[in-house]
Amino acid sequence: MKHRANGIDLFRIFAATMVVAIHTFPFQSIAPFLDEVITLTVFRVAVPFFFMITGYFLLGRLSLNFSYNNNQRVKKYLYKIGMIYLYSILLYFPLSLLNGTISLKMNILLLLKVFIFDGTFYHLWYFPASIIGTILVTLLLRSIGFKLTVAFSTCLYLVGLGGDSWYGITNQVPLLNKLYTFIFSWSDYTRSGVFFTPVFLCLGIFAYRVSKKLTASKILNLLFYVFIIGMTFESIFLHRFTNVKHDSMYLLLPSCALILFLMLLNWQPKLKVKESADLTLLVYILHPLVIVIVHSISKYIPILKNSLLNFLLVVVCSFILAQLLLNLKRKLRVSKQKIPFERASKEISASAIHHNINEIRKIIPKNTNIMGVVKANAYGCGMVEVAYELEKIGISFFCVATIEEAIALRKSGNQGDILILGYTHPNRINDIKKYNLIQSIVSEEHGKVLNLKKIPIRCHLQVDTGMHRLGVTPNVTIIQQMYLFSNLKIEGIYSHLGSSDSLEQESIARTNTQIFLFNNILSDLEQMGISYGYTHIQSSYGILNYPELSFDFVRIGILCYGFLSDYNSPTKIPIDLQPIVKVKASLITERIVEAGEYVGYGLGAKVEKRTRIGVVSIGYADGIPRALSNAKLTLEFKGQSIKQIGNICMDMMLVDLSEVEDISLNDELIVLPNISKIADEEQTITNELLSRLGSRLGTELN
């Protein structure tokens, strides 16, 4: 929704100014009636606007999907607002004591009333109201759904309305009088998180739900004018003919706030205000302090007692003070740029990831989507960073091997579907549910035990078509039974090809048998009337050697990272790949070793002449194979080749710097300049070499 935020962000400034006006009465010295009509009526849209922002950006997604990440966002918001409220209480504590809002002589119940509902200073009610309202709406959404939540919140607002601007009327009804007497024993006003906040949070949620369909409309403008004029007449009537207890709530205020918010979503001003949310939050918190200061100064400068001038001065000073604090925050904040890893790191190329995915998309059918296989820490490249980049280019389905990997990916903020390819013990079923993961059913027994747990979970059914590793027996009767289990929501079915990386005749025959068996199972299930969900059987080599296949997904692993597993095995379809990872380490010290001396562990490396030796801060614990010791590994620095000498140690390695120019301590060297060549020389595959890269290596995404 970032493309719709410009109008909202700019209006935050106007709304914050309106709040200042409500607390300063700018027209008091000129025409008090204008304060009644404008300040205490029209400007009342300001606070609902801020609550609607919370509903739109925080609870909108939650109302559609109670995922782990959406729930975490709510928890973080509540914690943040709670801390802001605490700091604000401390800031205004002396003034709260002076004006009697709180007193050390108050009993516990009265203090709770002040802290939970009223706020310890007149503007601080907003923060507990936001917390209570958010908790209430979240619980209602979870238990009764959005429509009933709106209805319930509307009823709460109407109750609150009767204790606010309409109190002069409702107070005449004995039963209602008793109700409001009880309510006011707990809160000075009905403008609170119980009666006021929920309806505006719901309106923000509604705006989120309709925002994609929203278009600019003159009808919205007309409706806004109708409702704002109607609310003005409502206010005039209530102020003139009734005893208004407060004027925060009007019958037409929700309608005005909703139409205004929808108009702002369509408004795309060129002017953009940086950090408008933080700026206006600080203005809201600080402006009463500025009011006190300006009021004190006005005793010595009488002209400042002019209400309009007083208001303008408070607004200007509040924004200046808020901006100064933001500037200070930037200076104190740790630089957003990652601190360079002084020891060793992996540099991940975002552009290479994009390139590789684009090349893959050229090969697969247009209707086939990509699953990003990010197991084993994205083949050693950095699971969180790679998945983040894949999400940016439209990949929203990810595969991992274990539930621990899946949870780590979800906790990183990943919003996509996450399929666990491997076995997960049924005792972890609560975690599968909690983190909204998709579990592979890897055997008949696995499926039966998971179903007996009586906790509904999302699943994909893995079928053993000939790999003979994981998967249920390719018997359609058994598979049908899995689909009938009430607690297994099977959303897809898949298999794995055991020999798709080879074009030898025996490998082709095995692969074709697997594909034939898989297709037959799908056909039989279809004839049985079973909706089997998504289908996928190809991994990286499956798309290169069997591009004619057309299933819902392909599982892309090694190709995403810019490598083939084995460059000696030809593929039917060529592909232009760019390696996404560079392994770098720092030169941490150097020294001269005289001829005839041994270096490193053992006696395998003896220098024949006076040699300049350097120490590079990476070793076999970081994934560099120890078998590459003694000149089998070549590093690079600014295009120069540097030979590794001696045995590679756990945490470092030695290099010969005798022929290297312009290298200094702390310079970074490329440690594995040609991963595919090294894998070939070590008679392994690039998958293994990459997956060895250790967790001590930092990850830099560029």
Swiss-Prot record:
The modification N6-(pyridoxal phosphate)lysine is found at residue 375. It is found in: Cell membrane. Its cofactor is pyridoxal 5'-phosphate. The gene is vanTE. One of its GO terms (cellular component) is cytosol. Residues 337-702 are annotated as: Racemase. Residues 34-39, 99-120, 164-191, 240-248, 298-307 are extracellular. It holds the Pfam family Ala_racemase_N. GO terms for molecular function: acyltransferase activity, transferring groups other than amino-acyl groups; alanine racemase activity; pyridoxal phosphate binding. Substrate binds at residues 469, 650. It comes from the Bacteria. Keywords: Antibiotic resistance, Cell membrane, Isomerase, Membrane, Pyridoxal phosphate, Transmembrane, Transmembrane helix. Residues 1-12, 61-77, 142, 213-218, 270-276, 329-702 are cytoplasmic. This is Amino-acid racemase.
